[in-house]
């Protein structure tokens, strides 16, 4: 072998060795230091989706070597349904010098981004397109401090209306319980979907749980056969209350997640929660291990699940079509 070739090979080998040794040292140091993880949600910290995201994320991080009480400190900031609190809560997390903020939903992510100066933000269950909302340059290359999970809630709500109409084939009127974050585009798509299905849809926007009963009363007075609950983290922990209000008024409900059907909604339809929760933890672990959020693609769910609660349907004296039940991933009897 020529001397120049030998030197080149040795030099390349040394560079590779230095790279892998450096990476190993970084990962070792990553697990030795104490990491600070912030959690920002517009809802309640321990209810519905937010609570489950927290639990699953901590389990995933523990599997990756980051454990509470050893090298991880967890900070929770929950707005309890009051969106006006999010900016101050985000500021508190930044002042606590967290290394990563998990933001449940677009509004929380925007508050975290405004409050921070480069703190990595992991979107968890963002309903709106992060590119259109200015949180990322593109899904493939976010280009900033925000990455994570996005699902097209606008289209998914339209699909829920289709499913509710299919489950209640004689129903001609439906209600839509919406959060204050309702966008014009979502309303337009739902209106078009309702027109295509030949049904009418009445929308009621509620600011807090105190407004639920009045909205359900209005739906009942309008003759609604069922109520579509808008996909929103604000509603994710309220399935038992929705079930009670709807059952008392003789109406079916379709909610955002399969677990909401288990908790009392007649139907639940949405992305596969188990996979999305674990993915949130995976993003955090990768950032702890040195990944740049600007280079971590924002992902969309590839699997959706439909759950039907026959116990609730029986209370409503509702016979769900056999063909419809055959499509369900889970039937609660």
Language-model segments: which ranges?
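Short hydrophobic alpha-helices and adjacent helix-cap/hinge residues
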Residues: 1-333
């Amino acid at each position: 072998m020529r001397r120049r070739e030998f030197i080149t090979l040795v030099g390349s080998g040394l560079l590779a060795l230095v790279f892998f040794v450096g990476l190993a040292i970084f990962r070792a140091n990553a697990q030795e230091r104490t990491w600070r993880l912030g959690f920002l949600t517009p809802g309640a910290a321990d209810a519905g989706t937010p609570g489950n995201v927290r639990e699953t994320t901590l389990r995933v991080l523990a599997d990756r070597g980051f454990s509470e009480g050893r090298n991880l400190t967890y900070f929770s900031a929950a707005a309890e349904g009051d969106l006006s609190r999010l900016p101050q809560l985000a500021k508190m997390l930044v002042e606590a010098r967290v290394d990563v903020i998990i933001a449940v939903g677009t509004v929380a992510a925007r508050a975290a981004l405004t409050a921070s100066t480069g703190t990595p933000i992991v979107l968890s269950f963002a309903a709106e397109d992060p590119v259109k909302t200015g949180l990322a340059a593109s899904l493939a290359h976010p280009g900033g401090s925000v990455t994570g999970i996005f699902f097209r809630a606008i289209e998914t709500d339209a699909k829920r209306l289709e499913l509710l109409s299919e489950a209640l084939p004689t129903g001609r009127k439906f209600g839509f319980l919406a959060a204050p974050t309702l966008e014009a585009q979502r309303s337009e798509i739902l209106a078009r979907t309702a027109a295509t299905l030949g049904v009418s849809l009445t929308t009621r926007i509620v600011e807090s749980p105190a407004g639920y009963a009045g909205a359900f009363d209005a739906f009942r007075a309008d003759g609604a056969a069922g109520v579509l609950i808008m996909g929103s983290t604000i509603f994710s922990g309220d399935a038992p209350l929705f079930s009670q209000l709807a059952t008392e008024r003789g109406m079916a409900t379709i909610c955002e997640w399969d677990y909401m059907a288990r908790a009392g909604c007649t139907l639940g339809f949405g992305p596969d929660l188990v996979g999305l929760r674990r993915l949130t933890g995976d993003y955090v672990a990768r950032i702890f291990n040195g990944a740049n959020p600007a280079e971590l693609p924002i992902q969309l769910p590839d699997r959706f699940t439909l759950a039907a609660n026959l116990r609730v349907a029986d209370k409503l004296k509702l016979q769900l079509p056999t063909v419809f039940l055959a499509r369900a991933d889970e039937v609660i009897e």
